[in-house]
Structure formats: C-alpha cells, structure tokens
UniProtKB/Swiss-Prot annotation:
UniProt entry keywords in alphabetical sequence: ATP-binding, Kinase, Nucleotide biosynthesis, Nucleotide-binding, Transferase
Top enzyme category: transferase
Catalytic activity: dTMP + ATP = dTDP + ADP
Protein name (database record): Thymidylate kinase
Native source organism of the sequence: Ruegeria pomeroyi (strain ATCC 700808 / DSM 15171 / DSS-3)
Record has ATP-binding as a keyword: yes
Stored HAMAP family: Thymidylate_kinase
Lineage: Bacteria, Pseudomonadati, Pseudomonadota, Alphaproteobacteria, Rhodobacterales
Family: Belongs to the thymidylate kinase family.
Family matches, as InterPro entries: P-loop_NTPase, Thymidylate_kin-like_dom, Thymidylate_kinase
Length: 211
C-alpha cells in the first residue's frame, strides 16, 4: 500500500451488482468514520472520463483491439496519477468499480488473445495492483438480463451476448485463482443486503488486520 491508504476494487461480469456494492460499501465505511474515495474505470478523473466516452459510446469497431487497449491504459494512468495515488498517499480508502482485471478480461479475451499485451502495458505504465479485489460472482444469464435492463448509451460491454458473458465469468474466476492473495469471491446470486453483508465483513476484517 502507498502511505496508509487501502486500495479496493470490485470486479465481475456486467449486471453482477458490483457497482451497487461498491456504493453501499463506501456508505458503510464513511458511516464508520473512514475517509473514502469512490471511483470507477474507465474514468475517475477528468481526462479518463473523456476517454471513457470514446471507448464506451459509438461503434466499437472503429478501434483496433490494440488501440483500444492503449486507450484504456491511458485512462488508467491518468486516473492513477490524479485520483488513486493522491488519495492513498493521504491515507484514504479508495474503492474502485473495475480496474486492470477488467481490461485483462474484456480487452485481453474478447477481442483476441491479447492478455500478454495487456499485462506488458500494465507493468510498464501502471505498475500496481489493488490491495484487495472483491469479485462479485454472478450467473451469466442473470447478469446479462440485468445489464440489458439498464438505460443509457454506455452499452458497449452488454452487447457481447451470453456466450462471452460465460467466458468472462470463467476468466474472472481464473484471475481469482491466479491472484488468490488479493481476490475474495462473493456469491452475487443473492439479495443485495446479503451480498453487502459479506462485502462489509471481508473489508472490515482486512482493514482491522492492516491498520
């Protein structure tokens, strides 16, 4: 960890409820007296939000897979410099809805086997992993149904369909095994409050152990 801060990320397929759980966790930790920054990727800083609009809206085929990975990495670098690292240096808890693990999955798998390229760019330009990653594991069909029910123009990932959702879920579970020291898997196929209770218990245990 940088300074005394804690860097937490939420990951999962679209429709898994991770964004809701990130928000609920932020509210719970703030109520307990923690100084929390709730952020997201792509985005989380003015420059990164501009890149978000480029990659999530409009025709995805206007970028090659390699160009898209560069855009996501550029957004993450700006987010890291302007939001995440200053907050961690100040001792704050940073909760991020998606981080590099999502790029490893969506760009690394969905547009060809580019995982090695994603990891090389990450090592060169980002150089850090979260302290704790909460994977909200969800049945892919249920997640896709939820995601399709959302309104808005950022439909990029939801357009991938059920087959890719299955691959993404399997890929996230593989990542959880690869980075077992920082991943915690949470069953997202339950009501929101039950999931939130598990999230809170895991995070408070981690905070108590590291502070």
């Amino acid at each position: 960890m940088s300074g005394t801060g804690l860097f937490l990320t939420f990951e999962g397929i679209d429709g898994s409820g991770k964004s809701t759980q990130a928000r609920l966790l932020a509210e719970t930790l703030r109520a307990a007296g923690h100084d929390v920054v709730l952020t997201r990727e792509p985005g989380g800083s003015p420059g990164a939000e501009e890149i978000r609009r480029l990659v999530l809206e409009g025709d995805p085929d206007r970028w090659s897979a390699e160009t898209e990975i560069l855009l996501f990495t550029a957004a993450r670098r700006d987010h890291l410099e302007r939001t995440i690292e200053p907050a961690l240096a100040a001792g704050r808890v940073v909760i991020c809805d998606r981080f590099a693990d999502s790029t490893r999955m969506y760009q690394g798998l969905s547009r060809g086997d580019l995982r090695q390229l994603v990891d090389q760019l990450h090592a060169l330009m980002i150089g850090r992993e979260p302290d704790l990653t909460l994977l909200v594991d969800m049945d892919p069909e249920t997640g896709l149904s939820r995601a399709k029910g959302r309104q808005g123009s950022e439909e990029r990932f939801e357009d991938f369909g059920p087959e890719l959702q299955q691959r993404m879920r399997a890929g996230f579970l593989d990542l959880a095994r690869e980075y077992a020291h920082r991943f915690r898997i949470i069953d997202g196929n339950r009501d929101m409050d039950s999931v939130a209770a598990d999230v809170t218990e895991i995070v408070l245990t981690h905070l108590n152990r590291t502070r």
